[in-house]
Amino acid sequence: MQRKIYDKLVKWKEDSNGKTALLIDGARRVGKSYIVEEFAKNNYKSYIMIDFNRAPLEIKNLFDLYLDDLDNLFLYLSNYYNVKLYERESLIIFDEVRVYPRARSAIKYLVADGRYDYIETGSLVSINENVKDILIPSEEQHLKMYPMDFEEFLWALDNHGLMELIE
């Protein structure tokens, strides 16, 4: 499914070159996870998607136990998700990061390490109760995602002619 935000993801990857993480914020069920996973499949050699709604405690605990030992953090993530990570060619996605704010605050150290790119997704991530007691990383670039507009809806229906007629 084609979305306008996809081009912004490509631009972020080109411009950031690993110097910032991307936080995609938007309402529930607008396709954040879908578009990020499509972007990962098309633009990286490998990716890991950590869905914090479903991630077991052992994955969440890694961010407390190994933040000062990133080699082991990446080793555990790679083995748990059975995905080989390639330096500067892999993306790690923190899906629904508001559920586990500790992972969001870890972005500062992960980006500084420079091995991989990071995208965080979430709804309501800027609500005070979801950012309480964490340091919001300055290494985050924000992108707002909205529901499909009419043109995107027509793309999804494979109806490109109607938009031309309207314009």
Language-model regions, residue ranges each:
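Phosphate-binding site recognition
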Residues: 1-167
